[in-house]
Structure formats: structure tokens, C-alpha cells
């Protein structure tokens, strides 16, 4: 393994941590309807648990309504039940072959609670990035011990990894700021 390999691994893993954080924040409900709200809803189907997005088309025809169209109509009740039991505070209405989900406006209290959750998710993302940094620094130290790196090369690589860490944590901070702004919009 070379310095370049370690840096490449760091960048890939940090990008994955940012993407995971982005997806988790997208699934937090804001004041308007968007299909990502339901992306993490788990439905009991075919004797297993599956993501709702794998079982149905989810659309947002307007800012206050989501429509779920199951591909298998026998799953309508299971999907309705899963949405009701999710902690999203939504009340699905079964309408023949589809499920309508009105999105009520968020109360101030609920907005603040969602911001706390968003901050927690973001902190988990930052912790993930720091764990990648720690792992990569250990890899560099191993390379130095094996005499594949000089002290100067090690120091340069450590600075590069710190630069990547700062860059990816900044990305998470920007995503969080945008989500907080979105949640506070009335």
C-alpha cells in the first residue's frame, strides 16, 4: 500500500460518510412533501422487511401531498401500516390502488425536534469521517514502520489527510445548514 492508496481510500470512505449523512437528512421530514421522506420506511412484505421505495412508486404531486403507488396491490395494507408506525407523524389514506399521504405543516416544537435529530445525524457523519482519518493515519504509521515512508513523507501525508477530513466535515456542515434552513421555513 502506498501513500496514494491510503489517500484514495480516505477520500472514498469520507465521500461515503457524507453521502450517507445526506441521505439520512433527506429522509427527515420538512414542511413540504418530497419522496425521500419515505425512503427509510421499512415494510413487512414477502415474509421479510423491505424498503418502501423498492415496493412502490412514490411521487409528490404538490407541496402538501405524497402519493404511494404499490406495484403489488396486495401490499397496500402493509404499506399503510408501515407508514402509520413510522415515526414521521403521517396519516396515510388508502384510495383504491394508491395511498395518499397529506403532509401537515410542522409545529414549531416539531421543527426544533427535527433540527436536534438533524444535528445528531450530522455528528454521526463527522464521527465517521474522523474514524476514517484515524484508520488512515494508522495505515501511514505502518508504512513508516515498514520503512516505506520517511518522516517528511509521513508528515505531508498526515497533513493531506487532515485537509481531506476538514473538507468533508465542511461538506456535512453545509448540508446540515441547508437542512436547518429548510426545516425553519414556514
Curated annotation (Swiss-Prot):
Keywords: Cytoplasm, Protein biosynthesis
GO biological process: translational termination
Superkingdom as given in the UniProt entry: Bacteria
Major localisation: cytoplasm
GO molecular function terms attached to this record: ribosomal large subunit binding
InterPro entries, A to Z: Ribosome_recyc_fac, Ribosome_recyc_fac_dom, RRF_sf
CDD domains, sorted: RRF
Gene3D superfamilies: 3.30.1360.40, Ribosome-recycling factor (1.10.132.20)
SUPFAM superfamilies linked: Ribosome recycling factor, RRF (SSF55194)
Subcellular location: Cytoplasm
A GO cellular-component term linked to this record: cytoplasm
Role summary: Responsible for the release of ribosomes from messenger RNA at the termination of protein biosynthesis. May increase the efficiency of translation by recycling ribosomes from one round of translation to another.
NCBIfam families documented for this protein: frr (TIGR00496)
Family: Belongs to the RRF family.
Stated name of the protein: Ribosome-recycling factor
